[in-house]
């Protein structure tokens, strides 16, 4: 199953959602292999597991640019050279700052969007779950991820600016559904403070819009908290994988993950 996390707005917890859904899958499906492919040049997926993306020897860009394994070699860096095992049953394929120039690189024919797609397809042959963390835009990397996905998760912060962007993403996804009729989409509110009137109003409006557009809307949400960043800072793990997680926040991600699996008609047992 390929799951993309998409929003053209930054700061909505895309990476936090991707890494914690991955952590939840570790607990819900311990026998199944999972991998997160980082398509966001900020490299926050590897940072979420205590890695500095700028100090990693091999990353996604090295595969795309066909970098030799060593000087003078005719053998190029491959997927296996880049994978990092970050938890039992969970790997990541990291990226770094250079991936921010993907559209420029593609326009200069350094590599093609189809090369990225091929990497995703290769991962899907080896892993039960492939999670794609995408950059905050709707450019080539994101469109490639969406075109390959079984489920697209759209985390959004329920503020006054979110609705227009959400509907534009939904409209874009509709074009992919023409070729992939089984594609599922789910909206998930993040940074929610239920005591804030604006948050409740925006969530209600988003639910209505989602229903009109035949898009699933999560029954659960991610609460506003600093505990996720604290987990990464102190334990170098997403909150869903730390040794003594807050039960409330762990359960939020577990329930959201169950919804994603149900949406894709995936039987956990």
UniProtKB/Swiss-Prot annotation:
UniProt superkingdom: Bacteria
InterPro entries (alphabetical): AAA_dom (IPR025669), DNA_Partitioning_ATPase (IPR050678), P-loop_NTPase (IPR027417)
Family stated for the protein in its record: Belongs to the ParA family.
Protein name per the record: ParA family protein MG470
Lineage of producing organism: Bacteria, Bacillati, Mycoplasmatota, Mycoplasmoidales, Mycoplasmoidaceae
């Amino acid at each position: 199953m390929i799951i993309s996390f998409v929003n053209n707005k930054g700061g909505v917890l895309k990476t936090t959602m991707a890494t914690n859904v991955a952590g939840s899958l570790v607990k819900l499906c311990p026998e199944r292999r999972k991998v997160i492919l980082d398509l966001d040049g900020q490299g926050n997926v590897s940072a979420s597991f205590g890695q500095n993306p700028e100090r990693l020897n091999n990353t996604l860009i090295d595969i795309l640019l066909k970098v030799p394994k060593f000087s003078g070699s005719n053998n190029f860096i491959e997927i296996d050279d880049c994978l990092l095992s970050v938890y039992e049953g969970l790997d990541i394929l990291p990226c770094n700052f250079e991936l921010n120039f993907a559209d420029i690189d593609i326009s200069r024919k350094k590599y093609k969007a189809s090369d990225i797609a091929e990497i995703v397809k290769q991962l899907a042959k080896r892993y039960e779950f492939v999670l794609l963390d995408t950059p905050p835009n709707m450019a080539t990397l994101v469109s490639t991820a969406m075109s390959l996905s079984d489920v697209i998760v759209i985390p959004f912060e329920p503020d006054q600016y979110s609705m227009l962007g959400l509907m534009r993403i939904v409209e874009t996804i509709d074009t992919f559904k023409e070729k992939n009729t089984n594609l599922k989409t789910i909206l998930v509110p993040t940074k929610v403070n239920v005591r804030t009137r604006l948050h409740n109003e925006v969530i209600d409006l988003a639910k209505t819009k989602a229903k009109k557009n035949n898009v699933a809307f999560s029954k659960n949400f991610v609460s506003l908290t600093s505990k996720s960043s604290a987990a990464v800072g102190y334990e170098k793990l997403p909150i869903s994988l730390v040794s003594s997680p807050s039960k409330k926040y762990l359960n939020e991600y577990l329930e959201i993950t169950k919804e994603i699996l149900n949406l894709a008609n995936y039987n956990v047992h």
